[in-house]
Amino acid sequence: MNSASRLIVPRLLAALGVLLVAGCGKKEAATAAAPVAPAAPKARVPNTTAQAYYQAHPAFFLFKTPADVPADLKWEDGSDLPTFADPAAKRGGTQYSAIESWPPTLRIVGPDSNNSFRQYLLDDNGIELLKRHPNAPGYTPGLAKTWAVAADRQTVYFKIDPDAHWSDGVPVEADDFMFMFYFYQSPHIQAPWYNNWFTEEYTSITKFDAHTIAIRLRGPKPDPLERAGLQAVPAHFYQEFGADFPQRYQWRVEPTTGPYTLYAKDVEEGRSITLTRLKNWWANDKKFFAHRYNPDRIVFQLVRDRDKAFEMFKLGELDAFNLLVPPRFWYDQMKIPEVDKGYIQKNVFFTFQPRAPMGLFLNSKKPLLDNHDIREGIAYASNWDKVIQVAQRGDARRLHPWADSHPPFEHPTLRALPYDGEKALAAFARAGFTKRGPDGILVNEAGKRLSLTLTFSSTALVDVPPILKEEAAKAGLELIIEQLDPTAAYQKSMQKNFEITLSGWGGGAEFAPRFWEFFHGVNSVKPQTNNLTNTDIPELNQLIEQYDRSQDKDEMIRLSHRMIELVHGDAAFVPGFTQPFIRWGNWRWMKFPASLNVREAEYSGQYGLHWIDEDTRKETLQARRDGRSFERVERVDTKWKTD
């Protein structure tokens, strides 16, 4: 859920896995993955279908001249903000990482696209018009060189950087932003959230010339830049865009404005995916992109078993490893000579951003779960405190109800329901489950057992379900544990074919939390939406619509608090735990800035601040062969610590 970004739909965390890696999917057909980007720039070819759409919607797609740009605008460029990359960073080398399963598609929108691998193609790779600074208030330039907010705080003007190019050499121009709205408003993409957002949140886009546009929001916003700072869509790439879009573009990789691209030759089916850095990337020397995205290549090897991946990391076959969960990797399995001898370094970095909603999502349209008393009983029967103390060894805290750590929108007093066996039994009794069977599980008068399936995929959370199962049984609830491949679990969630799923959403800092995609009834029951709980509460629907239309921050805060109360009362989302830091290990040849990372980092490599020093790699491997040691390194950075 990156602010001011083309990616506004949060990605489902099917796995919390290897560093720079999260759960992905499985490719179903051995078709071509990515067309090789040509060396020479392509000429821009008009998209006739899109142009016809513009003509059919003249109030939305406007064409004016540079003389029509208001003369009194105050243009900004973010140049007063500090940089956050390290000038000492070295460009070059190959980075070795791992993925737990194969991505279900290489599309960036449409069915199955909202998977965790997309971050490497789009979310953390593509460039927006502008982006929130990760350490300080304000925005940094991206595709836009300068921007200006109109006095009505409803229209934002952008001057596109003439240096900006797609990875295939085609310049980024105003036409790509015009096409973006056509693309996301089209039913062909089979993405209801995008259709709604790009139709309801914006009223027009104006092209003044090839490098000047204006985006008009539905109404004035407290932070209009966040809504208007979008990514472009390459119009020239989608000449074949139509009703068969999901199938036609299933394994095609669209050109990117970011530093890394994917070529067909670098997709080894079922083995690895390799990203290549563009040698002449247009933003190489821009103030806020210099000294970032440094490795020439990033190799993602398919390693389905997390313990095997850790062994590869110890051998130096992977450059880094996510040590956040499960904590046994940090506390136990890092007690190794490679750490003591300084070959592998340990890092903890506290972040400050809204906490990703992770916990139990209850499908309220399934039998039993369609009963509020059952859902409330499950909330009381979920012993997250024990999960935190045992599975997480105490270095986490209970997640608050929706919008945790998103002041002032988070609820000031409301907290997640605690584990309470007596209250769980009382709730189950109200639903008719009053007697225990011979194994202690509750049954109703018809003899039906209080039994539900808990689906999860993340090997990083493998210690959590057994604790939840054991504690729930004390309250008469049977949880049948179903662990699936990340792709299967992700697709099951998107098809709404689960009963209870243990999962979370990738998040990020933005002005205000989102509710529509998660809880509005229009997204209930439908596949490929983020309303996993199938929530459909009339009052909540009305408040969400009012919240999304609101032009007043104080009103939005009030509405947010009330919506959180309704979500909490519905008990279809049982908050799990959160950890206000990221934690990883890396071989000493993977270098990080002295500042280590940025305040809003979701994972250590998100902002591309690290680099690979191949000379240090050779030195380290030779030292290991010779038995020589270096200084032991364990960094703990608390400058952004708040909880």
Tell where the protein language model's regions lie, with residue ranges.
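Surface-exposed binding/hinge segments that line
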Residues: K27-E28, K90, Y194-A243, R248-W251, ...
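N-terminal lobe/hinge region of extracytoplasmic solute-binding protein
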Residues: F61-T83, G92-A151, Y182, P255
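Extracellular/periplasmic solute-recognition and catalytic clefts
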Residues: S186-P187, A191, I205-K207, K265-T274, ...
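Detector for C-terminal structural segments
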Residues: K27-K42, P46, G78, D266, ...
